[in-house]
Amino acid sequence: MKEGETDDFPAIAEKLCDPAVVGILVGSPVYFNNMSALCKAFIDRCIAFRKNGFELRNKVFGALAVGGARNGGQELTVSSIHAGFLGQDLIVVGDGKPSGRIGATLWNQNDSIAGDEFGVGTARGLGRRVAELAGLINR
């Protein structure tokens, strides 16, 4: 960015630090078996939370990835996103029962995930798991 230009990060950062926010989901398309440059830039900028006393500590975190093929790098992408946030002292979860996967792994078929029942199921499971654990922690 040029000097004086701003983007959405300050507003997003403020929301993420809000004590009412107890769960965070981050997703990315899969590019060459990894997250997008935009997702990586977001993670890199999140270092500010760590430098400010681990402001995201103990929030529940999940990751999802959408690839152009089944087994098209989604698991690697989710793992990379997890790695970027483990250093923030977040509580990282997968999608839970019934599949018990690393996170949400979706397949974009013909510009839509609608036909990917398995992937949509992992996304629903991830959302449920983040909400479930956040509820337990914040009783």
Regions found by a protein language model. Name each.
Residues 38, 55-102, 117-118:
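Short, glycine-/small-residue-rich phosphate/pyrophosphate-handling segment
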Residues 1-52, 98-139:
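N-terminal beta1-alpha1-beta2 submodule of the flavodoxin-like/Rossmannoid cofactor-binding fold
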